[in-house]
Amino acid sequence: MRMRPTLSWTPGADLPPGTTDLAPVADALRAGGVLVLSGAGISTESGIPDYRGEGGSLSRHTPMTYQDFTAHPEARRRYWARSHLGWRTFGRARPNAGHRSVAAFGRHGLLTGVITQNVDGLHQAAGSEGVVELHGSLDRVVCLSCGVLSPRRELARRLEEANAGFSPVAAGINPDGDADLTDEQVGDFRVVPCAVCGGVLKPDVVFFGENVPPRRVEHCRELVRGASSLLVLGSSLTVMSGLRFVRQAAEAGKPVLIVNRDATRGDRLAVTRVALPLGPALTTVADRLGLRVGDAATA
């Protein structure tokens, strides 16, 4: 039986209250040297839900674990059916004002880098460069046998051919690209193997129960060491993969600033948490800095 990932903290318990004052965020960016750490909350305005915010998908959806995926063919079939259907929507998501604001900060030399916990590629689509995808990307798939990486669009084409007419109506989409389907809707969905060696294909993302590659973690730690401050955008910081960088920055005496509507696990380490929607908040900050944030058509 799969276990639902659980919270190891109580949101809002004896934590500093959020504010609506964006001045500290604007001041940090004006000073430069800011490292951005983004989470699922920055993509909700693009139609991709988060895990733990209001109405988050963990309330109705148990994400696939690495252990289940690698051990059980039926779990892989269920995953790929849901992911294939979800990709039709997920793959069409477009950057929102939050992503475009981050790209504008980067273009004007205010950032030292962007680390994202998201797997949607929307920072890059908005124009951000050198983005570190902490948890990988749904744009790629990897063979667990031969290690070959291939484009997700090619797998999508092969799955379409193997499952002609597969078009159940999903109840929703999740941050990991899964569509909400029942076992009956999954039916006899056919999974395709690696085109090179016939091995098992997996999205090039870090599943629950899987570790972020050590080299990637160290690269992120280097980015924290080189930054003047850390700006967290849309992350509850519930999992250690992101929280560790907040702790590192705070221990080094670097200001940590958070923009997230709900309480986060890192609030005690931050100089401020702005409790505002990300798109409008970051657009306001950009305006204060005299920066132009491109519209959706030009992002």
Curated annotation (Swiss-Prot):
One Gene Ontology cellular component annotation held by this UniProt entry: cytoplasm
Enzymatic reactions: N(6)-acetyl-L-lysyl-[protein] + NAD(+) + H2O = 2''-O-acetyl-ADP-D-ribose + nicotinamide + L-lysyl-[protein]
Active site: H135
Domain of life: Bacteria
Residues given in the record as NAD(+) binding sites: 39-59, 117-120, 234-236, 278
Sequence intervals crossing the membrane: none
UniProt entry tagged with the keyword Transferase: yes
Record bears the keyword Cell cycle: no
SUPFAM superfamilies: DHS-like NAD/FAD-binding domain
EC number(s) on file: 2.3.1.286
Record: residues binding Zn(2+): C143, C146, C194, C197
Enzyme class: transferase
Necessary cofactors: Zn(2+)
Molecular function, one GO term: NAD+ binding
Subcellular location(s) of the protein: Cytoplasm
Domain Deacetylase sirtuin-type: residue ranges: 15-292
Binding note for cofactor: Binds 1 zinc ion per subunit.
Keywords carried by this UniProt record: Cytoplasm, Metal-binding, NAD, Transferase, Zinc
PANTHER family: NAD-DEPENDENT PROTEIN DEACYLASE SIRTUIN-5, MITOCHONDRIAL-RELATED (PTHR11085:SF10)
Database matches in NCBIfam families: PRK05333.1
Family: Belongs to the sirtuin family. Class II subfamily.
Chain's role: NAD-dependent protein deacetylase which modulates the activities of several enzymes which are inactive in their acetylated form.
Protein name: NAD-dependent protein deacetylase 1
Organism: Streptomyces coelicolor (strain ATCC BAA-471 / A3(2) / M145)
